[in-house]
Amino acid sequence: TGADYVINGREVQDVPARIRELTDGGAHAAVVTAVSKVAFNQAVESVRAGGSVVAVGLPSEMMELSIVKIILDGIRVVGSLVGTRQDLAEAFQFGADGIVVPVVKLRPVDEAPEVFKEMAAGTITGRMVLDFASL
């Protein structure tokens, strides 16, 4: 189990092309948790015809996705959010007010297999962030 491939965006110039190459035409789905416009565009370019892009991250800027590619390739783009807009606004306010302090642990990406084992075992508290800068 685990990842079949790891692609370092600092080492690979065209990440979507590399994903399409490794997956024989593109990924079936991409889940974007980043808040970067680049990540969303790369996700659309990385999935195969009929694939899906799930948007979880909330970018602060307007997105400029390739509508032509989305339509011609039948790519499904969906948002994923748990709760209502009011719930989200309140959660952000709690964070801004210091009422809720997130528990975040940073681990080097080479520890990913151990992190996934901990996730499967249910022993992680808070959020776990994999540091790709450690590559």
Summary of predicted features, one role per range:
Residues 1-42:
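Adenosine-nucleotide cofactor-binding segment
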Residues 10-15, 57-61, 82-83:
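Short, acidic/turn-prone active-site loops that include or flank metal/cofactor-
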Residues 26-27, 78, 98-103:
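A local structural motif
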Residues 34-35, 57-58, 134:
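Short glycine-/small-residue-rich Rossmann-like dinucleotide-binding loops
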Residues 41-44, 85-135:
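C-terminal hydrophobic helical "lid"/dimerization subdomain
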Residues 47-49:
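Helix-to-beta-strand junctions that scaffold the AdoMet/dcAdoMet cofactor pocket
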Residues 51-53, 76:
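Short glycine-centered segments of the SAM/dcSAM-binding site in methyltransferase folds
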Residues 57-73, 85-93:
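Rossmann-fold NAD(P)-binding glycine/threonine-rich loop
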